[in-house]
Amino acid sequence: MSAVQPQEAFAVPAWSSPLAENPEVVLELRNLTKHYARRRGQSAPPAVQQVSLQVRRGEVLCLMGTSGSGKSTLLRHINRLIEPSSGEVLIDGSAISQLSAQELRTLRSRRIGMVFQHFGLLPHRSVRDNVALPLELRGEPEALRHAAADLQLHAMGLDGWGDHYPHELSGGMQQRVGLARALVSEPDILLMDEPFSALDPTIRRDLQSHFLQVVRERGITTLLVTHDPAEALRLADRIAVLRHGQLIQVGTPEELLKQPADAEVADFFQEHGARSATPMATIAPRKSATTPAPLSPGLSFAQALLLGPAALAASGRGGLYWLGFALELGAVAALGQGLATASFAWAALALIGLLSSRLLSVALARRPSRLRRSDWRLPWLVLLLSQALVLWRVLATDASGPWLQFPADRQVLLGTAAAIDQLIAWSQVTFESTFVGVIVAVRTVIESTESLLGWLPWPVPALALVLLAWRSAGAALALTSAAALLYIGLFGFWERTIATLALVGSSVLISLLIGVPAGILLAKRALARRLITPLLDVMQTLPTFVYLIPAVAFFSVGKTPAVIATVIFALAPMIRLTALGIQEVPKTAVEAALAHGATPWQILTKVELPLAAGSLLLGINQTLVMSLSMVVVAALIGAGGLGYDVMTALRNIKGGEGMLAGAAIVFCALIPDRIIQATLRQRDRTLHQS
């Protein structure tokens, strides 16, 4: 096989489309506009406004402008990483807005390559796999895509670096990898978003020369985003100058130097060549749309003195309102005590508290502030009502009635409880097959796990655990694991430990099967976050034994309801940490995969989940520890295991036996926790080492 055969294997016919009006024009932007959603109280000018531009085949066009001018936003419209609010992007005369999802992925993976300012490399993959990513996303065979990647690495001067990882390369080398990845599918359009700005000057100049040589040799149409005038003048055939989302001027470097469109364009390039003395026109710079919030005037002395803490609430200082609230209630209580006992000391204390609160209110509420103001009426009414009730409570020695004791109705409680019982009974009849299915599935998992662990000769799991501990964290944890196993075996806890591990392992497995998909949904859907997050908050605040009530109500007693209660108790951290891991995946890595034709499933499985593995491991660890914390509580409904030994010891008031069984539970939590923590530290060193 010749050196070029891998690349030839990926060659595709030209994208079928109507002929462009101008055969030299490969890319056209027509009246492109992009509006983003407005923030509350602020106007949002268009990020891109009515931009029309044509790019000829093989041309290097620089999108030039200061930060915030819309360069990168405009560039991302070309491969639909950003959808326009209006206008069209045409490639070879065909509007890409009409492409289906599959056609768009084909366009990205075969015709358009993209290079990013911050590289967008996947830290968990080798350099070779990073370069071959666009071909992998297309489903090309491994041998062909690796051969093509090696060919591009050779062209970039990176021979021998294919088996290394991105953190082992310098910034310039990483950007060469990014350029090789963009070119591996032989695109005819190359998008480059400030690819040289993060590099040292010497590395930058060398990589610029190499880039220019490659695109000239291959005839690649290139759009290069930059804010560096020298870079644009040196690399571009033409330069498009943008300002506040508007296209100000398009021309060759010579035209921009000799005939700038206005004074700002002239000033932009003045240090890099001669320019005309008189610019063609002057366009006033647009004022920033965002201005600081105006100062709100403070309250008058009389208002602040009269309202007291309510003045602080009205001026946006809610925390200080509660401090004044507490001071004044204390002052009122002291005043009531002074009136009841005719004590001067209590009256003086009341005066001090009241003065402290009012002086604090006057001093702070009169100041002008940018804090958001609110209405004073409700805080003031709550303060007055609370003061009146506290004063009444102090003065009324035989206080009773509904103001002191909340009115309760036992019949309401009994009626509500009966309604809940009826609902449970109805559910058990209506959804009997569902409950039976859940019971069978959970019991199968428990019994299979317990049977496997009980069937194995004890040295097999013991040796496996010690070896895993040694490989994960070294000799210290291996010795600790051996000591824990000796303790469990010597004191006769082995069978109980097997039962406990079956219970906990089943709970962790089910939590994984439910928690990971739920966490992914939580990370990707705002509606799911709004609906599920309050439920997770409730799940994480209830006491452990509360989870036994619905489990027993629907599934009776035994190991099955114990596992279900444990899953409900331990599920919330798995969901939250999965969502957190997905949300913390670098946007550049996701965008790079998307720009090269990844499907949503490929982004999830090849980018997000691998990079979120650390958070997933933390979720597993937290779920494991929380499941073990339920062992004793679950023994109340027949879960067995080490929790049964602890409960028996407590019931018979045998503290020694209870402590020994409890120590065995601690060992069951300690060893996996240390193994997972060591794995996380090793992973962090691998991904973040520089």
What are the residue ranges of the model-derived segments?
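Conserved ABC ATPase "signature" region
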Residues: 95, 136, 143-161, 213, ...
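ABC ATPase "signature
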Residues: 250-251, 259
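Conserved ABC ATPase signature
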Residues: 165-169, 173
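Helix-to-loop junction immediately C-terminal to a conserved catalytic motif
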Residues: 79
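Transmembrane alpha-helices
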Residues: 564-568, 600-634, 656, 660-672, ...
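Conserved catalytic motifs of ABC-family nucleotide-binding domains
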Residues: 186
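Catalytic Walker B motif of ABC-type/P-loop ATPase nucleotide-binding domains
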Residues: 190-193
